[in-house]
């Protein structure tokens, strides 16, 4: 059953290739304009509108102007595809469009109906050819050619939650005897405390060392976000007294001694240290004299300071992740190396070991604020495609499907003796133990993107599109609504609280009122809306009406070492975001308000998260997503994705004008207001922070990578300490802010094609 679930989720994208039925080619009416369909609101497409204004003001008089048509304001490419298929089935000659942004499988639907537009008349020489080759693998296309342009692309990255991973590894790691003085004082005071010595080790290679350094830095950064309420947790008498009753498991995990592992471990440590710094600063004003003397003693040594900072972070993470357990098949005796993150097989094995070592991961009943797993995958289908393609040696003949004679051929998948099927079985067997341990989550089966859970330390690491990376970090004192097993982050710009009304202003139908951020308010009514009222919504669902009339007492809390719970006077939240899935129990979809979908949320617990309980950008360690299934696979596979610009046949005149516009879009050198000359395609990609796979962009990225490598070598030669210099010159997780504007295309730090704003 789990195999079917895994495959069913992963094959959703493939299945869409096969569902369209042809109705035959037809001509649209010639209305003298080119319509470009998008799945965003007009306001969100402001950069695109600026681009079109530039074209319309400078085009030849005989060429048709281009205008934007909004199909869906929520960014749903699925809804955009359904709209296109609906118009194809109806042979809509009057209200169709000429261009649209969507995924290439939409070309299959167009081709089945003979409505694909061959773009061979467009000069595509600026593109790196390999990024156009996907056109050869679109099913249903009869004549080879260019039908979709990869104008808006993103990649995938692996994001490590530095503070969480530091707590996991530090708990399991075999100690080397260099305990901090504070820790020593704690152990002396807690004389009855039982210990179990650990056996996990860190590899000593350079890659692992750098990674561990980054993880340590993330823990430091996390500790820096502590508040005064955490002052007593490290050295106060009450804390020590509490610890007398607990057993401390000291792990046996080994950190690899290779350079890569050393560097990674340093990054992880730094993340934990940063997480603990502010907490320790705040301690000085509130701790007892005895505790203060311990801190003063410890401050004589900088390295001991850093140890305390990571301990502060670890103590906070421990509250949600629980005690480390030294168990067989877990991290007991395990050697941690940085290359564990380079292949799916080794990454899954590591995640299983973590899940077995922390019992909270495998708990049956979880709320939206509990630990959700170890490993999150934003797109299961992308993980399956990448792992399968790598396992097949990067050969389409060994892939899940191939395109033969314009059709998707799945014969390899159904042949149990094929390399494809054997590889797929190995891939599933790699994921199955993690599924069994409840250590894997994905966007497909949860109502919350995986990066949102990592944002609140509920995951250790995750793979996600770079498109979501800018939304992976929490703001100060962020609020969340916990609704059963679900959690929703409160966006103050689109979610507004409704408080219980003391009176109904003489109207018995008034259920509540919400104030928006633009000095307007919206009133909720049952039965009917009074005449003349425009800023109002009619509530029809009787369950919601009952919840608003008789609200349950909701709670408001702040998660910290001294959590407080108070009664919350908010009885409902209105969310102007249709991506929140309704359940007609606690979350209800209302009528549209203007052009916006509105969702009502009741029966929630409101939580305020302080910084030490959230992931900040400096605390993330960013790596390429796994590019192999097994370490021995001959080729590395990096997935790039995103909607393409697709042409749709209309009529001879409009088709001709469409080709002219696309040639301008890809090749014209335009002077923009920022004073830089670039093509419209480059302008839009930069404004929207997408990867544009132009040759010159990729070449510039390669040069930046070479320059960065030389820079790092020089720094190591000058100082003799790559870990220290990493934070100054070559460490994307810690620095790079001054270089932000220099890089486009591939990230100089993680070597992946990504959003420009992701390069820090």
Swiss-Prot record:
Q: Show which residues constitute the signal peptide.
A: 1-20
Name the domain of life this protein comes from: Bacteria
Q: Note down the stretches annotated as region Disordered.
A: 221-243, 272-315, 705-741
UniProt family annotation: Belongs to the MG185/MG260 family.
Q: Where is the lipid attached (S-diacylglycerol cysteine)?
A: 21
Q: What is this protein called?
A: Uncharacterized lipoprotein MPN_199
Compositional bias annotation for Basic and acidic residues: 272-284, 705-721
User: What GO cellular component entries does it have?
Assistant: plasma membrane
Residue ranges, compositional bias (Polar residues): 300-312
Residue positions bearing lipid (N-palmitoyl cysteine): 21
Q: Which InterPro entries has this protein been placed in?
A: Lipoprotein_10_C, Mycoplasma_lipoprotein_cen_dom
Q: Which UniProt keywords apply?
A: Cell membrane, Lipoprotein, Membrane, Palmitate, Signal
* One Pfam family here: Lipoprotein_10
Indicate where this protein resides in the cell.
Cell membrane
Its membrane topology is listed as: Lipid-anchor
């Amino acid at each position: 059953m789990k195999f079917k679930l895994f495959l069913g989720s992963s094959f959703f994208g493939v299945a869409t290739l096969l569902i369209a039925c042809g109705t035959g080619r037809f001509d649209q009416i010639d209305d003298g304009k080119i319509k470009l369909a998008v799945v965003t609101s007009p306001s969100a497409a402001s950069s695109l509108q600026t681009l079109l204004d530039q074209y319309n003001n400078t085009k030849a008089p005989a060429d048709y102007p281009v205008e934007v048509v909004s199909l869906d304001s929520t960014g749903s490419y699925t809804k955009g595809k359904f709209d296109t298929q609906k118009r194809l089935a109806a042979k809509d000659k009057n209200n169709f469009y000429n261009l649209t942004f969507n995924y290439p499988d939409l070309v299959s639907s167009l081709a089945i109906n003979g409505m694909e537009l061959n773009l061979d008349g467009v000069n595509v020489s600026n593109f790196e050819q390999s990024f156009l080759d996907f056109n050869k693998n679109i099913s249903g296309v009869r004549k080879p050619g260019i039908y979709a342009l990869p104008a808006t692309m993103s990649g995938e990255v692996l994001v490590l939650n530095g503070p969480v991973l530091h707590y996991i590894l530090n708990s399991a790691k075999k100690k080397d005897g260099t305990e901090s003085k504070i820790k020593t004082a704690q152990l002396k005071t807690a004389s009855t405390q039982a210990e179990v010595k650990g056996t996990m080790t860190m590899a000593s290679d350079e890659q692992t060392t750098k990674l561990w350094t980054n993880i340590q830095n993330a823990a430091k950064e996390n500790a820096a976000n502590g508040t005064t309420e955490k002052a007593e947790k490290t050295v106060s008498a009450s804390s020590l007294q509490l610890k007398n009753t607990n057993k401390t498991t000291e792990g046996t995990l080994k950190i690899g001694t290779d350079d890569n592992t050393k560097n990674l471990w340093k990054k992880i440590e730094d993340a934990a240290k940063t997480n603990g710094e502010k907490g320790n600063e705040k301690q000085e004003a509130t701790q007892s004299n005895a505790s203060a003397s311990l801190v003063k003693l410890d401050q004589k040594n900088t390295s001991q300071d850093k140890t305390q900072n990571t301990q502060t972070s670890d103590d906070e993470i421990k509250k949600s992740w629980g005690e480390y357990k030294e168990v067989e098949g877990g991290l007991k005796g395990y050697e941690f190396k940085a290359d564990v993150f380079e292949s799916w097989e080794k990454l899954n094995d590591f995640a299983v070991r973590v899940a077995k070592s922390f019992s909270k991961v495998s708990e049956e009943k979880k709320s939206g604020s509990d630990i959700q797993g170890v490993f999150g995958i934003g797109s299961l289908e992308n993980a399956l495609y990448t792992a399968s393609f790598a396992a097949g040696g990067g050969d389409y003949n060994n892939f899940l499907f191939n395109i033969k004679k314009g059709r998707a051929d799945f014969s390899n998948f159904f042949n149990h003796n094929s390399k494809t099927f054997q590889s797929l079985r190995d891939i599933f067997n790699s994921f199955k133990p993690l599924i069994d341990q409840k250590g894997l989550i994905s966007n497909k089966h949860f109502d919350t993107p995986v990066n949102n859970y990592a944002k609140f330390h509920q995951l250790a690491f995750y793979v996600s599109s770079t498109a979501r990376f800018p939304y992976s970090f929490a703001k100060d004192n962020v609020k969340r609504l916990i609704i059963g097993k679900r959690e929703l982050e409160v966006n103050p710009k689109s979610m507004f609280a409704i408080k219980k009304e003391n009176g109904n202003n003489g109207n018995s139908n008034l259920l509540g009122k919400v104030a928006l951020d633009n000095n307007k308010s919206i009133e909720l009514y049952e039965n009917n809306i009074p005449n003349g009222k425009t800023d109002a919504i009619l509530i029809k669902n009787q369950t919601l009406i009952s919840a608003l009339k008789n609200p349950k007492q909701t709670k408001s809390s702040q998660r910290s070492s001294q959590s407080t719970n108070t009664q919350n006077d908010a009885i409902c939240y209105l969310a102007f975001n249709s991506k929140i899935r309704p359940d007609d129990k606690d979350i209800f979809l209302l009528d549209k308000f203007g052009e916006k979908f509105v969702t009502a949320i009741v029966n929630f617990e409101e939580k305020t998260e302080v910084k030490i309980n959230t992931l900040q950008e400096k605390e993330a360690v960013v790596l390429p997503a796994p590019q192999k299934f097994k370490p021995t696979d001959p080729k590395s596979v990096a997935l790039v994705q995103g909607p393409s610009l697709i042409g749709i046949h209309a009529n001879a005149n409009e088709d001709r004008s469409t080709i002219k516009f696309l040639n301008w879009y890809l090749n014209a050198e335009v002077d923009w207001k920022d004073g830089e000359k670039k093509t419209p395609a480059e302008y839009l990609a930069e404004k929207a922070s997408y990867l544009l796979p132009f040759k010159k962009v990729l070449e510039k990225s390669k040069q930046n990578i070479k320059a960065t490598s030389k820079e790092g070598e020089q720094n190591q030669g000058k100082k003799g300490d790559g870990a220290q210099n990493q934070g100054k010159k070559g460490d994307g997780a810690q620095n790079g802010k001054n270089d932000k504007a220099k890089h486009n295309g591939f990230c100089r730090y993680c070597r992946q094609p990504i959003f420009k704003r992701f390069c820090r």
